């Protein structure tokens, strides 16, 4: 009796599967078409490195304030500095430190210069420091082609809220950084540099505003 009942149930289940299979078969083309459309839409909406570069490189000038925190293993509290910055797409970067002391810096293709009573003076740098300055400019300007030379890049998010993770590729940078994390929206908002020795630097760019042109004083600083 049990064998007979099992056989009947198995037969019913087989018939049900056949009917269900027909329904599934009829639905499959529609499901596949829907998945195809979803894939096309996702690829069209994907935010990539070229779009990020175009977005960050669009403003001719960006002005704002910065807060820099240097986290050292030997100190319980970070070393904090504050100031203003002016980023020019064509000229470079003015980094105007206001606290805890006042000091103006300029970073451009020639290197880093410090303002003194005699004017702008180039700072003698080792190759590692010079490379870090080039990296800093490339990050703020969104120069992904320049960053690709020295880092593996991983971008996630959207144009309104994105994160770019940099893993050092070159031997020189591997000796300095474990990783660099950059995040932002229309402009760069936060940069975190994780160093190999356990120290880290967090840089927050606040109240950043795009502009059309440099002021006369800013243009003078870049030309001197």
Residue ranges and their predicted role:
Residues 144, 148-152, 156-224:
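Gly/Pro-enriched, hydrophobic low-complexity segments
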Residues 32-42:
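Bacterial N-terminal signal peptides
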Residues 115-138:
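Acidic/charged, solvent-exposed loop-and-adjacent secondary-structure segments enriched in E/D, K/R, S/T
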Residues 59-61, 80-82, 90, 100, ...:
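Extracytoplasmic
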Residues 66, 93-97, 112-115, 164-166, ...:
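Short hydrophobic/aromatic-rich beta-strand segments that constitute the beta-sheet cores
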Residues 75-79, 84-89, 93-99, 104-107, ...:
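Structural recognition of beta-strand segments within beta-rich domains
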Residues 3-33:
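Bacterial N-terminal signal peptides that target proteins for export
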Residues 43-65, 71-76, 220-224:
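N-terminal leader/targeting segments and the immediate start of mature chains
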